[in-house]
């Protein structure tokens, strides 16, 4: 059935929709399936299925219903581009406080339309949230400024937080795990649980929490510097998340503000993120996106992009989210990921299709991880343009020939090298841990800095 007469209006202008302030706008790349309708017909069916319609006309539709139809307002078949305007009235709101929810946004904009028989593929690349609706989202309650404050740094441009993920990600018992934490903290700032770590039979949660607490206290005494840890509290059960969080805060006592809470936001979903955001508003909310590649990967033509995921995370209240390495690490990514970092940190930013004003909503910190080491960092910082972020290097720290503490120091020295605008090989001559990173990650060194061995006086 051709629904374009109802669910499409190509005379609508985007600037007028934005000025009106009552529509969420979404941009998709879409391809109709062969043998069905043309591009506009498929787009209109997509809008119908995403809002007030179905595959047939129904007798219960009235004039009010038609007033909240989602409308296709722009198409470009040559680019497979479709833009849809969703009236904000369509989206569910909390009974308890009238706040907005990402679960409803996803259900409409990327829900049943992903399984439509006449759509070969459809993927969301950007979305725009109008001011009145944006204000209904929680947004972050804490930011990187809170971590800088704990670390004793300036709360403006406090700089690089040197972090790690204890490796191996699974298989360490509580005390060896805590020992690795202590080792890294002798040179670094921040440690996170890897996303599967929790309450395994060989590493009971409470025993691990107590051991890490002791390691943090010893490291702080040894260095005279504050240390940070991000504990995974992800669970299927809301009450399990609360129990984990409360036990951690009770155990760490006066060091509670040194603790972030990690939530596997993609696999556990918006409900888990919001549980952590609302139950523990004083803690830094660390959004891990494990599993997101199933829909965000450039190889996937369905779902939504990592850019969209990160923008949703800011709305939900993530203090920080993993944003990839812009092609500098081992995970999928590209230099264009820079736009993602700007979208979640700035108060006014351009996405692939829409400009977004955040109206003072707290920023979300980019958390960089996945195959990074000290040699890759100067180029990464140059591409991003600043170093106000958290990086969690697992192999990049513990793969250092001299151990985790030296690995952490090499990462910090990499930032110093970039800030000075120094040549990395020349800088290495006067910074031992950074120099040893060349030997530790020689494959990267050969690729990034040909001839480094001779310059550092090492045999080829």
Swiss-Prot record:
Keywords: Calvin cycle, Carbon dioxide fixation, Lyase, Magnesium, Metal-binding, Monooxygenase, Oxidoreductase, Photosynthesis. One of its GO terms (molecular function) is ribulose-bisphosphate carboxylase activity. Its EC number is 4.1.1.39. Binds 1 Mg(2+) ion per subunit. Substrate binds at residues 112, 169, 289, 322, 369. InterPro entries: RuBisCO, RuBisCo_large_chain_AS, RuBisCO_lsu_C, RuBisCO_lsu_C_sf, RuBisCO_lsu_fd_N, RuBisCO_lsu_N_sf, RuBisCO_lsuII. It catalyses: 2 (2R)-3-phosphoglycerate + 2 H(+) = D-ribulose 1,5-bisphosphate + CO2 + H2O; D-ribulose 1,5-bisphosphate + O2 = 2-phosphoglycolate + (2R)-3-phosphoglycerate + 2 H(+). It is an enzyme of class 4 (lyase). Its cofactor is Mg(2+). Mg(2+) binds at residues 192, 194-195. The modification N6-carboxylysine is found at residue 192. GO terms for biological process: reductive pentose-phosphate cycle. The basic functional RuBisCO is composed of a large chain homodimer in a 'head-to-tail' conformation. In contrast to form I RuBisCO, the form II RuBisCO are composed solely of large subunits. NCBIfam families: PRK13475.1 (NF010002). Homodimer. Belongs to the RuBisCO large chain family. Type II subfamily. RuBisCO catalyzes two reactions: the carboxylation of D-ribulose 1,5-bisphosphate, the primary event in carbon dioxide fixation, as well as the oxidative fragmentation of the pentose substrate. Both reactions occur simultaneously and in competition at the same active site. This is Ribulose bisphosphate carboxylase. The lineage of its organism: Bacteria, Pseudomonadati, Pseudomonadota, Alphaproteobacteria, Hyphomicrobiales.
């Amino acid at each position: 059935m051709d629904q374009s007469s109802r669910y499409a209006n190509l005379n609508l202008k985007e600037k007028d929709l934005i000025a009106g302030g009552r529509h969420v706008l979404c941009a998709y790349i879409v391809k109709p399936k062969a043998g069905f309708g043309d591009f506009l017909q498929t787009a209109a069916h997509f809008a119908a299925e995403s809002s007030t319609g179905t595959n047939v006309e129904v007798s219960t539709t009235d004039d009010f219903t038609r007033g909240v139809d989602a409308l296709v307002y722009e198409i470009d078949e040559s680019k497979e581009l479709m833009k849809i305007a969703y009236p904000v009235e369509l989206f569910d709101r909390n009974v308890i406080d009238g706040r907005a929810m990402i679960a409803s946004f996803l259900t409409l904009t990327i829900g049943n339309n992903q399984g439509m028989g006449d759509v070969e593929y459809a993927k969301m690349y950007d979305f725009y949230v109008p001011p009145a609706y944006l204000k209904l989202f929680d947004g972050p309650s804490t930011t990187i400024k809170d971590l800088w404050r704990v670390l004793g740094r300036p709360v403006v441009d406090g700089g690089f937080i040197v972090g790690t993920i204890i490796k191996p990600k699974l298989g360490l018992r509580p005390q060896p795990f805590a020992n690795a934490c202590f080792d890294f903290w002798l040179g670094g700032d921040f440690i996170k649980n890897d996303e599967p770590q929790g309450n395994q039979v060989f590493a009971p949660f409470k025993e691990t929490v107590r051991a890490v607490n002791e390691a943090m206290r010893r490291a702080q005494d040894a260095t005279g510097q504050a240390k940070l840890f991000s504990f995974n509290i992800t669970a299927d059960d809301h009450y399990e998340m609360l129990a984990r969080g409360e036990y951690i805060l009770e155990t760490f006592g006066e060091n509670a503000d040194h603790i972030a809470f990690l939530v596997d936001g993609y696999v556990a979903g918006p409900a888990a993120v919001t549980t952590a955001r609302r139950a523990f508003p004083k803690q830094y909310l660390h959004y891990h996106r494990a599993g997101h590649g199933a829909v965000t990967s450039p190889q996937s033509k369905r779902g939504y992009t990592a850019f969209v995921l990160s923008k949703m995370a800011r709305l939900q209240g993530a203090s920080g989210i993993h944003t990839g390495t812009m092609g500098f690490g081992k995970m999928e990514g590209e230099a264009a990921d820079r736009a993602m970092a700007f979208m979640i940190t700035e108060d006014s930013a351009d996405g692939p299709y829409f400009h977004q004003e955040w109206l003072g909503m707290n920023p979300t910190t980019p958390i960089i991880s996945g195959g990074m080491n000290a040699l890759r960092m100067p180029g990464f910082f140059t591409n991003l343009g600043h170093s106000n972020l958290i990086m969690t290097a697992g192999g990049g720290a513990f793969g250092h020939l001299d151990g985790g503490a030296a690995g952490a120091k090499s990462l910090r020295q990499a930032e110093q090298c970039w800030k000075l605008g120094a040549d990395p090989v020349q800088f290495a001559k006067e910074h031992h841990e950074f120099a040893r990173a060349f030997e530790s990650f020689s494959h990267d060194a050969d690729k990034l800095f040909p001839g480094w061995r001779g310059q550092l006086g090492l045999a080829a």
